Amino acid sequence: MLIIPAIDLKDGACVRLRQGRMEDSTVFSDDPVSMAAKWVEGGCRRLHLVDLNGAFEGQPVNGEVVTAIAKRYPNLPIQIGGGIRSLETIEHYVKAGVSYVIIGTKAVKQPEFVAEACKAFPGKVIVGLDAKDGFVATDGWAEVSSVQVIDLARRFEADGVSAIVYTDIAKDGMMQGCNVPFTKALAEATRIPVIASGGIHNLGDIKALLDAKAPGIIGAITGRAIYEGTLDVAEAQAFCDNYQG
């Protein structure tokens, strides 16, 4: 299982939100590129970037920062989400050296777009499903739909999606542990690999994900915990690598 540091971009700075609320943000650095350097030096094998302004505006806003990080680390897999709603945007990021693009809102509102994107950019597409009480939320989490996460995830199996990033909104940024039972249920209900996100606080939460014994869970995204020091990237990755269970 991969430990994937998150860099959330808002107005060019690296921030963390609580429960997806833009007004409840903490700035951790005004230099996201050096923040990326910190996690790379800490031994991370993949980075998770989110253009928060982009998620709300429906188009990339912090694209230059993303490109700068991708250029600096050409051999590091980078995944970017937030405001990806056209094939042109995907092409822009892929050309910039980004390994994976995460389609969120558009995947819920126009699932056929995912099939289109997978066809145009095979192996590059991840679907981001953000949920509240098992139902999918969209538009920077401002709207909660009547679509169930597992039902939607199964829809994408035939498209060739590389992974699903599953975020439990109620847990995100709260550092109270992630929703292990639902993450496990999702991983077991679909053939698509799942990346857990939201609520990871310490090594105990990483252990809980591993203890779930769901081979489909291939990664865990962590944000606030690594910024506030309750989780160490290198230590957590070593724990995953050596886990015997």
From Swiss-Prot:
Active-site residues, record numbering mapped to chain: 8, 130
Pathway: Amino-acid biosynthesis; L-histidine biosynthesis; L-histidine from 5-phospho-alpha-D-ribose 1-diphosphate: step 4/9
Keyword Cytoplasm: yes
CDD domains: HisA
Keywords linked to the UniProt accession: Amino-acid biosynthesis, Cytoplasm, Histidine biosynthesis, Isomerase
GO molecular function (one): 1-(5-phosphoribosyl)-5-[(5-phosphoribosylamino)methylideneamino]imidazole-4-carboxamide isomerase activity
InterPro entries for this protein: Aldolase_TIM (IPR013785), His_biosynth (IPR006062), HisA_bact_arch (IPR006063), Isoase_HisA-like (IPR044524), Isoase_HisA-like_bact (IPR023016), RibuloseP-bd_barrel (IPR011060)
Name of the protein this chain belongs to: 1-(5-phosphoribosyl)-5-[(5-phosphoribosylamino)methylideneamino] imidazole-4-carboxamide isomerase
Source organism of this protein record: Pseudomonas putida (strain ATCC 700007 / DSM 6899 / JCM 31910 / BCRC 17059 / LMG 24140 / F1)
Name of the gene encoding the protein in the UniProt record: hisA
